[in-house]
Structure formats: structure tokens, C-alpha cells
């Protein structure tokens, strides 16, 4: 049985740990609020550019653009978004498990796929398994700006146009609520659903100088926006997952402290009882 000193030492160290996890929980809650606002504020822009691109797609169905053309899939790229740090529960493991499983099920060899990694955890995961990484981005701040990911997004789109890969899938954690995040996979390139526009016709446009030249500018911006929007979504999910993980850690620490305190009190009571018994026994022996 552990000594009173050992139990008291464990109680002290657990209390210090709970203070740290509580502080991290509060910090993550504040970051979540900002990240959620950033993700929501980007939605109107996404809706509008999707509406405009869909309108162009409807009125110019015969326009040929490299980002719209499907071709024989010889190689697939997966843009996987994770965090740079851990302590976020199943945030990273869920998205990595989903991406890795998809690669194993769909492809016969590593020559058929490659990874574009955003986040240190994902990059290290794929490097450890010797999965080819054709581009990576780490060290992003808690409040991501488009400037930080612009080069990677444009490089990714250009690699698709140049034929480095034939499909691009986006894998990330979609923010549902503070307690729920869903692993989401979307086929980003080629852009194949522009003509549908979700079945909603909102306005008619006149395009100058031509639909083709408008698409030449809009399509890369649209694809870049999809990547940036997914990253904002993932950031909100990361902070939510870390907040929940730290809350669970704090709650578990409190339960452990209660259990240790009970053990400490019992051990102390047993020690006192033992001392009283020894005193009484000694007194009886002297009579």
C-alpha cells in the first residue's frame, strides 16, 4: 500500500496538472470563438463565388478549361489537413485514419497516390509510412489568413493542370458544433459540378470580355477558396476538439484527486488506529 507521503505527492502533482489542463481549456474556448467566427464570415464569399461560377458553367457548357476536364485517373493526390500540435483528442487520428484507409483501399501501389500535407502531425504520419509527399505546409497560426496558404493552393492547382496528378481529394475535419466534428472527404479537382449550382438560379449575368476569360480567372480563385474554407473549418474543429479534450482531462483529474483524497484519509485513519492500538497494547502490557 502506498505511503501517506506518496499519496499526498500524487494529489499535489495531479492538482498542478488539472490547473494546466483547465487553463488550456479556457484558451481553446477563446480561440474556438474566433475561429468559428472566421469560418462563418467566409461563408457569404464562398456562396457568392460559387453562384457566379455556377452561372458561368450553365451558360457556357462548351467551354473547355483544364480544371473542368476529367481524364483517366493514373494518380490521385490527397490534401490532408491536420494540426501542428497534439492534445486534441481524436482530431488528428480520425482524419489520418480516414485518409490512410482510403489510400489503402483504392490503390495498388504508392505510385498511384501522393499527399499534400497541411499540418505537422499529418506530415510526420505520412513520412513515417514512406508515403510520397509532394507539398507540405506547417507552422500556421491559430487565425489563418489566405496569404499563408495562397502559395500552396496555387501550386496545388498548377500541379493538377500540369498533369502531376489527375484527381485531388480534400480530407479534413468539418466543424459541426463545439462537441461534434466530422471527418469529411471531397473531390476538389476536377471541378465537375459547376453547371448544377445546387439547382438554384439566382441571377443572370453578362460576362465581359467573355465567359472563357472570366472562367480563367474565377476557377483558380474558386478552388483556392475551397481549400481556404476547409482550412478555416478545420481550425475551428481543432480548437473545439482541444477544448473538449482538456475539459475531459480536467474532469478526470478531479475524479483522481477525489479518489486519492479518499485513499489518503483512509490510510491516515488506519495509521492513527494502528498507533492507538499500539499505545493501548503497550499500556496493557505494563499493568
UniProtKB/Swiss-Prot annotation:
BP GO terms, sorted: proton motive force-driven ATP synthesis; proton motive force-driven plasma membrane ATP synthesis
Localization per record: Cell membrane; Membrane raft
GO annotation, cellular component aspect: membrane raft; plasma membrane; proton-transporting ATP synthase complex
Gene3D superfamilies listed in its UniProt record: 3.40.1380.10, ATP synthase, gamma subunit, helix hairpin domain
Record bears the keyword Disulfide bond: no
Keywords, ordered alphabetically: ATP synthesis, Cell membrane, CF(1), Hydrogen ion transport, Ion transport, Membrane, Transport
GO molecular function: ATP binding; proton-transporting ATP synthase activity, rotational mechanism
A Pfam family per the record: ATP-synt
Membrane topology, record value: Peripheral membrane protein
Subunit organization: F-type ATPases have 2 components, CF(1) - the catalytic core - and CF(0) - the membrane proton channel. CF(1) has five subunits: alpha(3), beta(3), gamma(1), delta(1), epsilon(1). CF(0) has three main subunits: a, b and c. The F(1)F(0) complex interacts with SpoIIIJ and YqjG; YqgA is found in the same complex. Interacts with FloT.
PANTHER family named in the record: ATP SYNTHASE GAMMA CHAIN, ATP SYNTHASE SUBUNIT GAMMA, MITOCHONDRIAL
Biological role stated in the UniProt entry: Produces ATP from ADP in the presence of a proton gradient across the membrane. The gamma chain is believed to be important in regulating ATPase activity and the flow of protons through the CF(0) complex.
Family to which the UniProt record says this protein belongs: Belongs to the ATPase gamma chain family.
NCBIfam families, per the entry: ATPsyn_F1gamma
Protein name: ATP synthase gamma chain
Organism per entry: Bacillus subtilis (strain 168)
Gene name, Swiss-Prot/TrEMBL: atpG
